[in-house]
């Protein structure tokens, strides 16, 4: 049964729209946990467009579940993460002009740099994941480098319809099994919602789904605790 990681970046987006102190993502992380979240995910971007440094350090001190820090593989973020000591770090690609993360990390083309980076994080007892597209070459490189986890990018699956979505789903299923056989723990996320998450959650060997936007959108109508609870029930029926 897949567990649920709740991304609270969009709470911070609302706060930063007015450069004020509310809503506080730290407070909403507590509500997400009450709703059944198994972990809390935040992306500390280089431009600090939503989550801020104070958020991640307060979250580390206050949440009862696990903290997953998404970040680019930069020297600044390495220093911050080694000071914070989150439960997990997920390395993601990052472009300043993007609205949200647009694709997976190219582990294959950056193996030498990423191997040293991952080794440094693991020396601080931080488990490390790579956010990658469901491609065998990226999975192979992730295993070779020493990542503990991968997070399969489900954005394309979420955008497609009909037969094209089915084909992409098969790629994710095959990638999950392939990565699991290589000893990687497999998470998945990006674009998942109340209509499409169940099929991903039902894949054997999927460990956790990371979901943010759709839960926060649903929370506007029913509150965050209930929105998380509904998603948790949805992905736990398999």
UniProtKB/Swiss-Prot annotation:
Where does the record place the site Transition state stabilizer? 151
Per UniProt, the keywords (alphabetical) are:
Cytoplasm, Pyridoxine biosynthesis, Transferase
Gene3D superfamilies cross-referenced by the UniProt entry: Aldolase class I
Q: Where in the cell is it found?
A: Cytoplasm
InterPro entries, sorted: Aldolase_TIM, PyrdxlP_synth_PdxJ, Pyridoxine-5'_phos_synth
List the catalytic activities from the record: 3-amino-2-oxopropyl phosphate + 1-deoxy-D-xylulose 5-phosphate = pyridoxine 5'-phosphate + phosphate + 2 H2O + H(+)
Output one GO BP term. Answer: pyridoxine biosynthetic process
Chief subcellular location equals cytoplasm
Cite a GO CC annotation. cytosol
Catalytic center residues: 43 (proton acceptor), 70 (proton acceptor), 190 (proton donor)
Biological or metabolic pathway of the protein: Cofactor biosynthesis; pyridoxine 5'-phosphate biosynthesis; pyridoxine 5'-phosphate from D-erythrose 4-phosphate: step 5/5
Similarity remark:
Belongs to the PNP synthase family.
PANTHER family reported for this sequence: PYRIDOXINE 5'-PHOSPHATE SYNTHASE (PTHR30456:SF0)
> What this chain does, per the record?
Catalyzes the complicated ring closure reaction between the two acyclic compounds 1-deoxy-D-xylulose-5-phosphate (DXP) and 3-amino-2-oxopropyl phosphate (1-amino-acetone-3-phosphate or AAP) to form pyridoxine 5'-phosphate (PNP) and inorganic phosphate.
What protein does this entry describe? Answer: Pyridoxine 5'-phosphate synthase
Q: Which gene encodes it?
A: pdxJ
